[in-house]
């Protein structure tokens, strides 16, 4: 047995242990038909990413579950990997090239992609190394990348299958367009930011009725150039007579109709809505219903493309000039300040432009149905259950999914256009002959696929699909997905419908949802607020175990949590407590004789009590982990180690350890070692480093704690009678300590303790525990009796269950010194009361001071009055 260092130094042990785990391949999982599999797929972090608190929480939760199941004997696979992060990586590479004076266009597609791969080689593994620092026990031998050969093959396979089935099509629809990145982006990449803007109220003249206008209100007056109708509610009596009439569209030479559509809320605004089908998703739907023209007014860089005075202007410049022109024409009614949510690109913060574009889409109506049924039938469940409603809401209101992106980095769409006849061929490789015209001039589609398209296949593409591999057969479907509530729609739903469509099985049976890690004020961590906390900084200062414990303690599924540095310090203090207790136990084991012969009959009341406690803890923690109550499980382990084991049991057995003649010393050491081993195992999934270091030093024959058996509940360790008996002793000790604290008696001052009870069984409990009871209760002598005979009237008492504890007053307190101390305190309080009364009686103070200051002084007066009453009462008792 190696002796532990005097102080716990995480920086010294964590990297060393992680290297040992990697070399030992302890994280590796293989197909093993004699064992039950347990699989988690890691949500692949972006290769552009750096570890943040969200990653730290997400991966700590996954690691806890994997370590737990591994110890339970499952073949536990935690499948890791990274995401190519199309737009994020492309932006990073463009910026890097810009610094070198090179543009994306200069390099061309192939040259630019080479730069992207170089960037990935240089920076793509950074976040993986950071996950190592956290202690993540993922099977790094199996690490995948969304653009590796296998995953790319899966993407092509799915695209072609869905296209052939008629689920993938190319068409014009409204997309989120970023004018800076010049690509469509997913809803997931649109960040809605509240901005102060305006409602511009504009009059549209009614054709043929001079002086009659229809008033509309818009937050984007420049889109007027793309209006193809004005809509009113069919039940709105104000406008029934003009439905079907034409309006002059200001600033253009066009006329547009007034149409009736139930989309319009007649109670909102003027009850008239301008319809711009090419630049608003709701207007697009109205346009489809009424067969309206779709006029795209913007170029890809958000400059105006409509011939006329505004041609070539930026959208905001055009807005300014158009509003001024409307005002000159007398058509600008008013401008009303208006705060509203504006969609911005989360990468570059540019305002996103809804725009009709030719894009590739996935039809969602049919694919959504089995994903809905999976939840309703119980194949899939959410923890907490309430998030199932969010999942259903998204699926029941789902729109076709725009999967094309105007980027170069990513999976290129496998569509080839015949340059002679225009036919489209979708295939894994460029066709040699056009099936329609027989020519061989093809050009591949320039667009790439949405990043979510490949990550939707992650649970099965990482296991070898579309090939029928042993890994896929054994490890799929996976067991649990751990993720944040913010990507239920963007990732979870897409994995479910993709998994069912391609494999016939739901890709996981449970989705464990966690919330966000917020700052101490409850704000979301962000660069703009400057309130982000780097997990690596926490690890460097306090160790990975302290960070993991902080993130999990008190954390309930689905709820946001606040990060406090004080909690990290508490976690570090707990690690120190575990270390110091283990070191103390190991030092005593070293000095002891062989304890292998200890049997149950050698165990004392206290030994059986702590065994019953760790036994009950084992049952509770196992149940909590099975229900994904990670925070509750950790809190129970913490309470047991800190309170029951360290503060009580170790203190109970110290008299036995320090007494060479004590016949029960071997039993104490045997119990200490066994309980410590069991507690370390229960703590291991949460705090892997410190538990590994202690466990392997305590038992040099063991290679690692992570492959040891998870503790199981033992009926023979229930020890109910001994448990109840020891709880009685603890109750008595607490009562004694409370009395002594109230009387300011230091632990060094011993006093006789009388235990009075008519119950022989109670007296026997104290008889059997006399030595540690005396030690914990600071007793010079323990006297057990059935009545109060011989106990002075001045004795201080405390009532416990079936007994009364007495302590002679004179043994606790030096009466003369205590009277002197109380008189000094009385004098001090008289001064404070006089000062407080004077302040509150001063009219000037009461009339001019802030109310908070007056309330503070009133509270002081109340406190001093109570303290004075207690001092006087105590003096009266002593002077008797």
Can you describe what each PLM-predicted range is?
Residues 2, 16, 20-24, 94-213, ...:
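Residue patterns forming the tRNA-binding/recognition surfaces of aminoacyl-tRNA synthetases
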Residues 30-93, 146, 155, 216-218, ...:
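N-terminal catalytic cores of NTP/NDP-binding nucleotidyl/phosphoryl-transfer enzymes
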